[in-house]
Each structure stands twice: as C-alpha cells, then as structure tokens.
Amino acid sequence: AVYVASPYAAGYGYAYPYAAAAYRAAPVVGAYAAYPYGVATYPYYY
C-alpha cells in the first residue's frame, strides 16, 4: 500500500495537528490516533 506522508494530502487536514500533538505528548496514544493513516506515517510525526 502507498501512504501519503502528510494526512493533509489524504484529506485529513483537520486531524493532522491533533495527531502530531498526540505523538509529541504520548507516542502510544498518537499511534492509535494515526493508525487509520497507516503505520507507514509513523516516522513523519516524530
């Protein structure tokens, strides 16, 4: 599967700031929040 680095391009612009903040505050919570975008997006939030 091909994942877009930025959720904005996938139409999830409203969720990007929250997902990024979740990764910084709690990586585990952020992982669950960003799961729908695909595990491949994980590195982009760090």
Curated annotation (Swiss-Prot):
Report keywords, A-Z.
Cuticle
The protein here is known as Cuticle protein 4.9
Q: What does this protein do?
A: Component of the cuticle of migratory locust which contains more than 100 different structural proteins.
Provide the GO MF annotations for this entry.
structural constituent of cuticle
